[in-house]
């Protein structure tokens, strides 16, 4: 059973998939930092110093501290139930960037693939015979 598992795990597809998952996780961390630390702060500044990660709606006040809450973390620490739409906006921007990067990658891979030349069209046998008859009649 161990030999079968080893053969399965060492197949090219499984190893390639594992490498892809690891690189994908690292890429996800880079994109999250790009969105949270580079893209969203200028957008928030343009919209009047809005910190998207702290945009939320209190659905139910916390039992420990009364609203208003300064941040999502403060609201949740107080036991409030929150709808964190700012974090959702950040996630949508992150997803869009990842989806676009994957699109560009797939597009580049498709361009690199050598297009196989189309097989020459085979002339039907009756057409070949008719051409031979025509050529014979011309002589």
Curated annotation (Swiss-Prot):
UniProt-annotated location(s): Cell inner membrane
Top-level division of the source organism's lineage: Bacteria
Gene Ontology MF: a single term: mechanosensitive monoatomic ion channel activity
Transmembrane annotation, as ranges: 14-34, 86-106
Keywords linked to the UniProt accession: Cell inner membrane, Cell membrane, Ion channel, Ion transport, Membrane, Transmembrane, Transmembrane helix, Transport
Cellular component per GO, a single term: plasma membrane
Topology of the protein relative to the lipid bilayer: Multi-pass membrane protein
Keyword Transcription assigned: no
Record-linked InterPro entries: Mechanosensitive_channel_CS (IPR019823), MS_channel (IPR001185), MSC/AndL (IPR037673), MscL_channel (IPR036019)
UniProt record similarity statement: Belongs to the MscL family.
Function (record text): Channel that opens in response to stretch forces in the membrane lipid bilayer. May participate in the regulation of osmotic pressure changes within the cell.
PANTHER family named among the record's database cross-references: LARGE-CONDUCTANCE MECHANOSENSITIVE CHANNEL, MECHANOSENSITIVE CHANNEL MSCL
Quaternary structure and partners: Homopentamer.
Protein name per the record: Large-conductance mechanosensitive channel
Protein's organism: Methylobacillus flagellatus (strain ATCC 51484 / DSM 6875 / VKM B-1610 / KT)
Gene name in the database record: mscL
């Amino acid at each position: 059973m161990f030999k079968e598992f080893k053969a399965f795990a060492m197949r090219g597809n499984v190893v390639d998939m594992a490498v892809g998952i690891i690189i994908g996780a690292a890429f996800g961390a880079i994109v999250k930092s790009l969105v949270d630390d580079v893209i969203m702060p200028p957008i928030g500044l343009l919209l009047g110093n809005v910190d998207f990660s702290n945009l939320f709606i209190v659905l139910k006040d916390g039992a420990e501290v009364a609203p208003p809450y300064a941040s999502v973390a403060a609201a949740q620490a107080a036991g409030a139930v929150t709808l964190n739409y700012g974090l959702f906006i950040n996630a949508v921007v992150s997803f869009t960037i990842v989806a676009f990067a994957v699109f560009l990658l797939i597009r580049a891979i498709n361009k690199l693939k050598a297009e196989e030349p189309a097989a020459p069209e085979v002339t039907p046998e009756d057409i070949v015979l008719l051409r031979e008859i025509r050529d014979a009649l011309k002589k």
